[in-house]
Amino acid sequence: MQITKREFLKRLGLAAGAGLAGAARADEYTFTGETLPPGSIGDPTKPGFAKNIFPLPHTIEDVPSAFLKDGKVIQPAREVPVFHRTDVVVVGGGPAGFAAAVAAARQGAKVALVERYGSLGGLFTNGMVLIMLATERKEASGKWTFVTRGICEEFMKRARALGADVCNRIPSDTDDIHVQPTVDPEGAKYLMDTMVAEAGVEMFFHSWGVDVIQDGRKVLGVVFESKQGRQAILAKQVVDCTGDGDVFFAAGADYRQITHAMGWVTRLGNIDRVTA
């Protein structure tokens, strides 16, 4: 098959953007009709450069642009391509979304995790809110007991095992002082990536959940935006871990708007520790 240089560059640019967006998986890059020899991928001068090298859900020309009419911006109706089908889709890759996705995958479900940024952790890692809250309970005697279990407990123990103060303190059952552990943000991102990959969760970074797909009151999936455009994921179960209830809101659920407290997080480096 022969294509023009302009068409090749357009496909290459679109696919590069989709790859950076995390919305394109390796198994979508199909080559039909031929077995590719080494070095032929992406090279139109070699055998195997086939018509489906960068299959996109639509081309630029297929997407209708918004336009002005009587001073209003009108968005034409369009088909939203179904990009993926799964058992469970989790929207939001913060601590809650990370734990929900890993837990569901470990139970045998096929899980997709949609995260708007390029790393896991949400405000926990990217927002530097690094304190592990509610890890302990104060007994009647005044003693603090470590009560965290499940995936959070596993995360803390594995973070501690990484060393380099990734998790700087994990209280034991014998501690009689109250300690809130903190975690290094980059170490936490690495560990979350590791646990998600181990569980077999399918990750979609740089993908922002913007709407839901409904049949009456039943939610059948989510619509998300990425560099590849607006696409849909169909799922048997949809889990809202956006932090702000974005999926609930899009589905028409009742909500109450509140103002969260402000915080100022700082970190210091190259300072010797002194024990008081």
Language model features with spans:
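Short, well-ordered coil/turn residues at beta-beta hairpins
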Residues: 11, 225, 241-242
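Extreme N-terminal leader/targeting segments of oxidoreductases
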Residues: 2, 7-86
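Glycine-/small-residue-rich beta->alpha transition segments that form the dinucleotide
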Residues: 237, 241-246
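N-terminal Rossmann-like FAD-binding beta1-loop-alpha1 element of flavoenzymes
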Residues: 88-109
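Conserved beta-strand-loop-beta-strand element in the redox core of flavoprotein oxidoreductases
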Residues: 214-231
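Core beta-strand elements of the Rossmann-like FAD/NAD(P) dinucleotide-binding domain
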Residues: 84-86, 228-237
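Rossmann-like dinucleotide-binding core of oxidoreductases
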Residues: 245-276
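Conserved N-terminal/central alpha/beta ligand/cofactor-binding core
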Residues: 13, 39-61, 67, 83, ...
